[in-house]
């Protein structure tokens, strides 16, 4: 028996960051980058879906927003596998 095909568009972690965190909190990319102590270009590229979430970035996001780094890395892995 074959498994059903998931036809949903893969979601980049940058979209989640942009739509679920930055927009609702009214937080700018530059403000988040400063809070995470990373270059603003890193966060800009992630929210533009041009850069992957690394373990380092995942740890920083988890510390800042709560939750765990594994969740961010799982989002990235799911995106990469689709």
Feature names for model-found ranges:
Residues 56-71:
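DNA major-groove recognition helix of helix-turn-helix/homeodomain DNA-binding modules
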Residues 30, 41, 70:
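Key DNA-contact positions within bacterial/archaeal DNA-binding proteins
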Residues 24, 35, 64:
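Residues within the alpha-helical elements of helix-turn-helix
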Residues 2-27, 74:
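A short, Lys/Arg-rich alpha-helix, primarily the initiator
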Residues 28-34, 61:
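Short alpha-helical "recognition helix" segments of helix-turn-helix
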Residues 37-53, 60-62:
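Recognition helix of helix-turn-helix/homeodomain-like DNA-binding domains
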Residues 18, 67, 71-82:
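Short, charged recognition helix plus adjacent turn
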């Amino acid at each position: 028996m074959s498994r059903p095909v998931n036809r949903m568009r893969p979601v980049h972690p940058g979209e989640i960051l942009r739509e679920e965190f930055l927009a609702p909190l009214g937080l700018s990319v530059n403000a988040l980058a400063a809070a995470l102590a990373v270059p603003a270009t890193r966060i800009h590229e992630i929210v533009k879906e041009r850069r992957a979430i690394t373990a380092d970035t995942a740890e920083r996001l988890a510390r800042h927003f709560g939750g765990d780094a594994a969740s961010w890395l799982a989002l990235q892995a799911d995106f990469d596998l689709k």
